[in-house]
Amino acid sequence: KEGYIVNYYDGCKYACAKLGDNDYCLRECKARYGKGAGGYCYAFGCWCTHLYEQAVVWPLPKKKCN
């Protein structure tokens, strides 16, 4: 599974500015989803890879980013 890491509080994606390989995104994806996860900046959001099937990713149901 893959997807954008999401802030549970506000429903927004984790933003990033440096597209492609991005230490911030990689660190955040690993912190949320475990050391086997990967991450990079895609379309100015942190995209996480190698996730378990039940991983919660953006968009959150009933939670719109403001």
Curated annotation (Swiss-Prot):
CDD domains linked to this entry: neurotoxins_LC_scorpion
Disulfide topology: 12-65, 16-41, 25-46, 29-48
Cellular-component GO terms for this entry: extracellular region
Subcellular location per the Swiss-Prot or TrEMBL entry: Secreted
Modes of activity regulation: Is susceptible to be neutralized by human antibodies scFvs 10FG2 and HV.
Tissue: Expressed by the venom gland.
GO BP annotation list: defense response
Annotated PROSITE patterns: LCN_CSAB (PS51863)
GO molecular function per UniProt: sodium channel inhibitor activity; toxin activity
InterPro entries reported in the protein's UniProt record: LCN-type_CS_alpha_beta_dom, Scorpion_toxin-like, Scorpion_toxin-like_sf, Scorpion_toxinL
The LCN-type CS-alpha/beta domain, residue ranges: 1-66
SMART domains hit by this protein: Knot1
Primary location group: secreted
Entry keywords, A to Z: Disulfide bond, Ion channel impairing toxin, Neurotoxin, Secreted, Toxin, Voltage-gated sodium channel impairing toxin
Domains as described in the record: Has the structural arrangement of an alpha-helix connected to antiparallel beta-sheets by disulfide bonds (CS-alpha/beta).
Function: Beta toxins bind voltage-independently at site-4 of sodium channels (Nav) and reduces peak current and shifts the voltage of activation toward more negative potentials thereby affecting sodium channel activation and promoting spontaneous and repetitive firing. This toxin is moderately toxic to mice.
Family under the similarity heading: Belongs to the long (4 C-C) scorpion toxin superfamily. Sodium channel inhibitor family. Beta subfamily.
Protein name: Beta-mammal toxin Cv5
Species: Centruroides villegasi
Lineage, highest ranks first: Eukaryota, Metazoa, Ecdysozoa, Arthropoda, Chelicerata
